Amino acid sequence: MKRTPTAEEREREAKKLRLLEELEDTWLPYLTPKDDEFYQQWQLKYPKLILREASSVSEELHKEVQEAFLTLHKHGCLFRDLVRIQGKDLLTPVSRILIGNPGCTYKYLNTRLFTVPWPVKGSNIKHTEAEIAAACETFLKLNDYLQIETIQALEELAAKEKANEDAVPLCMSADFPRVGMGSSYNGQDEVDIKSRAAYNVTLLNFMDPQKMPYLKEEPYFGMGKMAVSWHHDENLVDRSAVAVYSYSCEGPEEESEDDSHLEGRDPDIWHVGFKISWDIETPGLAIPLHQGDCYFMLDDLNATHQHCVLAGSQPRFSSTHRVAECSTGTLDYILQRCQLALQNVCDDVDNDDVSLKSFEPAVLKQGEEIHNEVEFEWLRQFWFQGNRYRKCTDWWCQPMAQLEALWKKMEGVTNAVLHEVKREGLPVEQRNEILTAILASLTARQNLRREWHARCQSRIARTLPADQKPECRPYWEKDDASMPLPFDLTDIVSELRGQLLEAKP
């Protein structure tokens, strides 16, 4: 079943088409460090983008981080994601793993990634290999370092803005003079700045361009092959920073003299591209990334600008540290939601039957919405990614089993509601109120089950290795006596809709 694009997706696609039409066969201008106006343009139009050269980071940290990348790659911990874009399933050219606070998730391109936990204070985490545990600890150490650097950069930005200066440091080397906060800097600013740099996850990326011959060409500026297309990072706390550590493996790190006369960027070196969203007047930037360089996107840069990653010739890792918007994306959150939904269940029933305290329409509506949330935002998202997380840790096994048990109880709740709707003697008005309260959720449930089942059976899904193959879970056959309702709700939804239509004058 083809999904209808959202209004936001349609608007974005329309903007893209209009921009390409305006360009016709011409390229927009972009600048690299070889261009005389490169740094001036950076200062004027991209002041919240900061590059910190590799030389400003300690050799010890470089060594630890780069070994951690290679360790995770050796153990097969990074995976290409089967993502959903405008109703189509696509396999990302980049392999990824999410590391971060225990129980956190991060959603991008309609895919919820679950953290391989790093060892935060007070946690007791078991990884499958000691080397994997050590690598996760290293990325927590890098996270702490980048958080400190981000806070410093945000303080410098705040100080300069308050002093009405129109420049921030662009390329901060090891001996860059630090700027302190002015007297107008207050405690609330400090709290705000720290929260914007409170990185709770890092999304690790890896790609070997030699094994990806079909990479897309950058469409607006002619920047060459893209590893990651133009985008804003999704699902982040508003105005929070993003910090990226880049590690391109051994290869040509400097432009050769023969290439110095070439226009545009060196295709052998990885770059990050920046442009102002939907702006065809301001030149874009292509910033070369050498081994161990870090860059920071501060304040609202991620909202006002788009960025892409331009492939070099050598394999590259990156660690992208983010303040993920987790208000609806933690294990604690979804467990609390499940408990809220099940507050309506009577606890004194001895058998497996579910008895409800209330048939108040608002209570039933909330319960069915939570039922959908745990099924489609958590269980199906997790199992669609196969058994990949077991490569690193069993941390999610028990929570997923717990969520599935709670979800199964919610199936019993839905069954109890349907029994009530059919009960003889139930006033017509009350029946209609219940039907109106639950029908939208049940219709969505049926449609989404069909969609997820089809995704798991798709041709591209069948090509994945066994441990990454999507699993349609929960799934059960019609004759499964342990389940109160069928997997396919078509007949039930049709019957309920018919009852509601009959009742209308």
Curated annotation (Swiss-Prot):
Its EC number is 1.14.11.-, 1.14.11.53. The modification N6-acetyllysine is found at K216. Disulfide bonds: none annotated. Residues 213-224 are annotated as: Loop L1. Optimum pH is 5.5-6. InterPro entries: AlkB-like_sf (IPR037151), FTO (IPR032868), FTO_C (IPR024366), FTO_C_sf (IPR038413), FTO_cat_dom (IPR024367). Ubiquitously expressed, with relatively high expression in adrenal glands and brain; especially in hypothalamus and pituitary. Highly expressed in highly expressed in acute myeloid leukemias (AML) with t(11;11)(q23;23) with KMT2A/MLL1 rearrangements, t(15;17)(q21;q21)/PML-RARA, FLT3-ITD, and/or NPM1 mutations. It is an enzyme of class 1 (oxidoreductase). 2-oxoglutarate binds at N205, Y295, R316, F317, S318, T320, R322. Residues 32-327 are annotated as: Fe2OG dioxygenase domain. One of its GO terms (cellular component) is cytoplasm. It catalyses: a 5'-end (N(7)-methyl 5'-triphosphoguanosine)-(N(6),2'-O-dimethyladenosine) in mRNA + 2-oxoglutarate + O2 = a 5'-end (N(7)-methyl 5'-triphosphoguanosine)-(2'-O-methyladenosine) in mRNA + formaldehyde + succinate + CO2; an N(6)-methyladenosine in mRNA + 2-oxoglutarate + O2 = an adenosine in mRNA + formaldehyde + succinate + CO2; N(6)-methyladenosine in U6 snRNA + 2-oxoglutarate + O2 = adenosine in U6 snRNA + formaldehyde + succinate + CO2; a 5'-end (N(7)-methyl 5'-triphosphoguanosine)-(N(6),2'-O-dimethyladenosine) in U6 snRNA + 2-oxoglutarate + O2 = a 5'-end (N(7)-methyl 5'-triphosphoguanosine)-(2'-O-methyladenosine) in U6 snRNA + formaldehyde + succinate + CO2. Activated by ascorbate. Inhibited by N-oxalylglycine, fumarate and succinate. RNA N(6)-methyladenosine demethylase activity is inhibited by fluorescein derivatives. RNA N(6)-methyladenosine demethylase activity is selectively inhibited by meclofenamic acid; inhibition is specific to FTO and meclofenamic acid does not inhibit ALKBH5. Specifically inhibited by R-2-hydroxyglutarate (R-2HG), an oncometabolite that also exerts a broad antileukemic activity. The keyword Oxidoreductase applies. The modification Phosphothreonine is found at T4. Its cofactor is Fe(2+). PANTHER family: ALPHA-KETOGLUTARATE-DEPENDENT DIOXYGENASE FTO. The 3D-structure of the Fe2OG dioxygenase domain is similar to that of the Fe2OG dioxygenase domain found in the bacterial DNA repair dioxygenase alkB and its mammalian orthologs, but sequence similarity is very low. As a consequence, the domain is not detected by protein signature databases. Monomer. May also exist as homodimer. Belongs to the fto family. It is linked to Growth retardation, developmental delay, and facial dysmorphism: A severe polymalformation syndrome characterized by postnatal growth retardation, microcephaly, severe psychomotor delay, functional brain deficits and characteristic facial dysmorphism. In some patients, structural brain malformations, cardiac defects, genital anomalies, and cleft palate are observed. Early death occurs by the age of 3 years. RNA demethylase that mediates oxidative demethylation of different RNA species, such as mRNAs, tRNAs and snRNAs, and acts as a regulator of fat mass, adipogenesis and energy homeostasis. Specifically demethylates N(6)-methyladenosine (m6A) RNA, the most prevalent internal modification of messenger RNA (mRNA) in higher eukaryotes. M6A demethylation by FTO affects mRNA expression and stability. Also able to demethylate m6A in U6 small nuclear RNA (snRNA). This is Alpha-ketoglutarate-dependent dioxygenase FTO.
